Amino acid sequence: MNNSAFTFQTLHPDTIMDALFEHGIRVDSGLTPLNSYENRVYQFQDEDRRRFVVKFYRPERWTADQILEEHQFALQLVNDEVPVAAPVAFNGQTLLNHQGFYFAVFPSVGGRQFEADNIDQMEAVGRYLGRMHQTGRKQLFIHRPTIGLNEYLIEPRKLFEDATLIPSGLKAAFLKATDELIAAVTAHWREDFTVLRLHGDCHAGNILWRDGPMFVDLDDARNGPAVQDLWMLLNGDKAEQRMQLETIIEAYEEFSEFDTAEIGLIEPLRAMRLVYYLAWLMRRWADPAFPKNFPWLTGEDYWLRQTATFIEQAKVLQEPPLQLTPMY
């Protein structure tokens, strides 16, 4: 099965309910789809009126060993009292299989959206990220990848070269902007950072608030620098971002030491995410869910804006990185 061409067309509601029934769960409500394009995720209620979420993993994106490492990390975090949505075990197994689909069941954790402009909530998130990384430092992922230039820049560049989605009249300018951005990132990238296990996709949309933060969706967990789990929480102008980052770091360091030299990786990581995200959309284009939800990807205006975004980010990389106040 080719990962890029795979679709979830054969994953019918009956298939999902049969998979759950095999493990003793009777669905007593409808299956409510949750917002996930990479996997298929549904919320439901069982006959005891308990709410769960079932996640069916996209085949061939992660191996069984890689998914199990994600689950083991989540369970270690829960054991260390870090608020994370961790999978439910059935006869000691968290990774289940039905008709070739890997899936896992999680307790449904409700909550409000994390308020990225709420400094008190930001402080609490920083504190728990410090605890998360305290656990993350105990060992590394063996099977899951480490953040690096090849996965985030070099492989996407090859994909762009062969892509038919990019309008022919705009492709040369887009590839030139991509190459300049890759060169700028490469010039500012460093690999002497301390590597630890990360959430990997720690942005406001993956944090719920219930008298404190609840971290969800470890699907992108991998090894990398601590700052990867911090920078996506920053928003606003540079002064606001400085205050937010100082708040996070001060709370974070109650549990884990933070190397402030990693602040210089924020803009390279932002650039890498821009490139990687676009490549992800293009790899998934054969899945009908993607043209339906991202129709603008075929428009010339989008590629003009994307080219401009890459050019602007390359310029940002030439500027000094975010500076903390002297006390740091």
UniProtKB/Swiss-Prot annotation:
GO terms for cellular component: cytoplasm. Gene3D superfamilies: 1.20.1270.170, 3.30.200.70, Transferase(Phosphotransferase) domain 1 (1.10.510.10). It catalyses: L-seryl-[protein] + ATP = O-phospho-L-seryl-[protein] + ADP + H(+); L-threonyl-[protein] + ATP = O-phospho-L-threonyl-[protein] + ADP + H(+). Induction: Induced by the two-component Cpx system that responds to extracellular stress. The record marks S36 as: ATP. One of its GO terms (molecular function) is protein serine/threonine kinase activity. One of its GO terms (biological process) is response to stress. It is an enzyme of class 2 (transferase). It holds the Pfam family APH. The active site is at D201 (proton acceptor), D217. Disruption phenotype: A hyperlethal phenotype (reduced survival in the presence of antibiotic but no change in minimal inhibitory concentration) for a number of antimicrobials including nalidixic acid, tetracycline, ampicillin and mitomycin C as well as exposure to UV light and H(2)O(2). Lethality is mitigated by pretreatment with 2,2'-bipyridyl and thiourea, which inhibit hydroxyl radical accumulation. No change in cell survival upon heat shock (up to 55 degrees Celsius), rifampicin or fluoroquinolone PD161144 treatment. The keyword Membrane does not apply. It is found in: Cytoplasm. Its main location: cytoplasm. Keywords: ATP-binding, Cytoplasm, Kinase, Magnesium, Metal-binding, Nucleotide-binding, Phosphoprotein, Serine/threonine-protein kinase, Stress response, Transferase. Its cofactor is Mg(2+). Mg(2+) binds at N206, D217. Its EC number is 2.7.11.1. InterPro entries: Aminoglycoside_PTrfase (IPR002575), Kinase-like_dom_sf (IPR011009), SrkA/RdoA (IPR032882). It comes from the Bacteria. The keyword Protein biosynthesis does not apply. Monomer. PANTHER family: STRESS RESPONSE KINASE A (PTHR39573:SF1). A protein kinase that (auto)phosphorylates on Ser and Thr residues. Probably acts to suppress the effects of stress linked to accumulation of reactive oxygen species. Protects cells from stress by antagonizing the MazE-MazF TA module, probably indirectly as it has not been seen to phosphorylate MazE, MazF or MazG. Probably involved in the extracytoplasmic stress response. Belongs to the SrkA/RdoA protein kinase family. This is Stress response kinase A.
